[in-house]
């Protein structure tokens, strides 16, 4: 990717988008489009068309689309599905119409079948039923992946797709209702430590296994793929190891300094039993994550303790 080229990140303000923006600036990219649309505006075709008409981005990172943990998927399945469908269609079509050289679309590991051989390879996509707790969201993310493939076939465009493991890091959504597992556990344990609670209750059995990639590493992988990949098949982006939710919770408790009991509530849904990606294609290309899970958790908690709580208080004051 030419660092002199114009680059658009949709959505720049999200967890991955903000890390990607910072990384591009560090690399010396001089034309990261400074007129970004917020995630909510990406659902408006005319506004997306207006941005592409003005800025004419040569490279597009399609990161946008609402997401959340099991709670958010249970509470707002239609919102999550519709938002992602609209964002995908609007950005992909405008990238084609306005001559974007290359587009990278980020799907989600939720698009894999609920019961699938581990580690999950792209050949197993569509080979079984999806996890019911996030099926609407997963269908929308699958649609974006296949839309990129269809555009490649019909219009001969360089639209590629990647499937990331669970991404976490500074700037994540730490709300207890809608956040992903790491952000939710960090906040729960931090508040329990401050208020001297004796225990923290965690959804599910603690048995499901998950793979996690730090946001800085995910941003690095996005740029690597933009530079080195142009295939029709999606590429998995993971670290090659997974942890049970119990192991994760114990590690977060240590990082946060919470010394109380961890109580798992098996009456709450677990989601998929395991989600470990087969990232051998990316590894053979020469990419590796730089941050261990523990290092990433330390950086994330330091950010949350210093900035995240203040941001949440500011948001509450506005509401």
Placement of each model-derived feature along the sequence:
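NAD(P)H-binding glycine-rich loop region in Rossmannoid oxidoreductase-like domains
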Residues: 45-84, 97
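Adenosine-cofactor binding site in Rossmann-like domains, unifying the SAM/SAH pocket
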Residues: 31-50
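Conserved beta-loop-beta element that borders a ligand/cofactor-binding pocket
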Residues: 102, 107-108, 145-173, 183-186, ...
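Conserved catalytic-site region of short-chain dehydrogenase/reductase
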Residues: 69-70, 105-121, 136-142, 154, ...
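Conserved Rossmann-fold NAD(P)-dependent oxidoreductase catalytic core, especially the SDR/UDP-sugar
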Residues: 89-134
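Conserved catalytic Lys-bearing alpha helix of Rossmann-like short-chain dehydrogenase/reductases
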Residues: 85-91, 140-148, 182
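Glycine-rich "substrate-gating" loop/helix at the edge of Rossmann-like oxidoreductase active sites
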Residues: 133-137, 165-180, 204-216, 239-241
